[in-house]
Amino acid sequence: MAKEALKTLQSMFGEMVASFVFGFAVYSAILGSSISQSSADKVIVGLTVGFSGIGVIYSFCDVTIAHFNPAITLAAILTSKIDVLQGLGYMLAQYIGFMLAVCALLVCSPVEYKETLDTIRPGPTDFGATSLNVFFAEFFLTAIFVHIVFATAVNPYKPKVDTEGKFVDPDEKEPVDRRITAPLCIGLTLGFLAFMGLASSGGAFNPGLTFAPMAMSNTWSHFWIYLGGQYLGGLTGGLLQVLVLYKLSSD
């Protein structure tokens, strides 16, 4: 019993640290590219999102769920892929991790507190994006992301087997082992989705990443637009994979 409790605590702590590392990487890239006024600022951020995601998943997946995204975890809870209380614990750990990432960035930032938070806080782009544009951008980006995460890691296809371990469907073949390639696939998805949101929402598709700088700056404009799109999109992507696009067996 004590060992199980310790494993749970380790897993929760691991999820918090994973969220911290990912958040610190992304926030640092956003701030650094903005301060340096690099012409490749969007590319820098997109590559950081993708590569840091790959590294975090590979290094933390043995001790925790390595979601570092509350939209994935909520979708997993509502599709019964994870226990409710455990899932809520992971979500809390994720939010704390992102808050700590903002705190760490503030200590490292060479510019003042307000400017740092204004720079990393998500908001509509300067191209005239409306609240509706932002909502649907975050909805579709998060739906795509969560669907891919479910298909490769949370709910990958597993053929039915009998008591002897043989396939129930004689025509069934051993499925592709995605354990090695899933982090790479998810990280690359993070990267290309970050580029897809450039015209409207900026491409956050992560409630934790969105919430932390808003909470630290006490600036809540567009908060519900972002979180509403992200959580609804995540649930849609998860349900689509579980109920509609999970491979059907022929038995």
Swiss-Prot record:
Keyword field: Cell membrane, Membrane, Repeat, Transmembrane, Transmembrane helix, Transport
Extent of motif NPG: 206-208
Predominant cellular place of this UniProt entry's protein: membrane
Matching Pfam families: MIP (PF00230)
Ranges facing Cytoplasmic side: 1-11, 64-86, 155-179, 246-251
Keyword Membrane: yes
Domain notes: Aquaporins contain two tandem repeats each containing three membrane-spanning domains and a pore-forming loop with the signature motif Asn-Pro-Ala (NPA). In microsporidia, the second signature motif differs slightly and is Asn-Pro-Gly (NPG).
Full protein name: Aquaporin
Lineage: Eukaryota, Fungi, Fungi incertae sedis, Microsporidia, Unikaryonidae
